[in-house]
Amino acid sequence: MAALKKRYYQKIDEEVYSAILDNGMSLSIIKKKGFVEKAAFLSTNFGALDNHFYIDGELQSYPAGIAHFLEHKLFEDEQGRDVTLDFVKLGADVNAFTTLEKTTYYFSTLDHFEESLELLLKFTSSFTSSEDSVNHEKRIIEQEINMYQDDPDYRAYLGCLQSLYPNTILDQDIAGSVDSIEEITVKDLKDNFDCF
């Protein structure tokens, strides 16, 4: 790892320490005076926009919602268990979100920061799943998609995007559609995990 570089942001009175890790990931640390709670965020440049990309000059195309689906599945360990339970045992809260451009996994805790950080790095560093597990997750994501359809603010937002960017990935829900998530396979998820 390169040495930490300190940057001071006068307008918000914050110091940010940053470095590039040996694996190419960016690290940023912000020490918050007077705060007891600690948090860590791990982001990857893989979001809803990234369902068409080139590998070795060949176009790869995946169903809408693949990044969000992978976000869900990474919370499953090798035995099919929900890793959230491991964070709960440490007194930590863990979650994730997918945007158009990235997916972020994060946790916050008062104690056991190092152990929680190890868990975060472990569960985001490997992917294992079964077809049965993926099919089960499709039902969960389908419910999530339908829930957003009941939210007038979200429907207005998506309607604006659909009007501004018709027939593009921007006119689709970040989670995809009920139809698009039905197309997602274990192989699709593994291919995208390996790529990003």
Which stretches of residues belong to each language-model region?
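His/Glu-rich zincin catalytic helix
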Residues: M1-D82, F193-D194
